[in-house]
Amino acid sequence: MINKHIIGLKITTTNENNQAQEDINQLRKSFYGQSNAELQTFKKEPYTYVVYTNYQGDFQQGNYDCYLGIASESTLTGFASCDIKLEKYQIFDFPYYNPQDTLEARKTIWADQSLKRAYLADLEIYDFEHNRLQIIISTIED
């Protein structure tokens, strides 16, 4: 089971018309600016998380929330937070060297038509120290 409390920044976006790419790039700029320094004291793991949740459709259409942050046991004033609890999910591991790697990893997952997605929450876990990206997709089946 995955059980995480994430604090950081939040946007609502859509993949329609490449809007998410623009919105998430702006979110990253904000996070890695002033916001990241404030959050470091609350960080309980060396990872950075991106959480996609509250899907109003699937990955191709409809709005969803995107959080960029850290795992923490605290909630911090001025920052968004979300709780992720997943019992059924599939894990994908990829090398990570730049933001384009995330898009290529997502394309690989989106192309997998056997994946039975639940659209509860999906996570990207960035391990910058080891150049790894782990993507966790909520599924209907194990």
Where are these regions (language model features)?
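A solvent-exposed interaction/effector surface
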Residues: 1-142
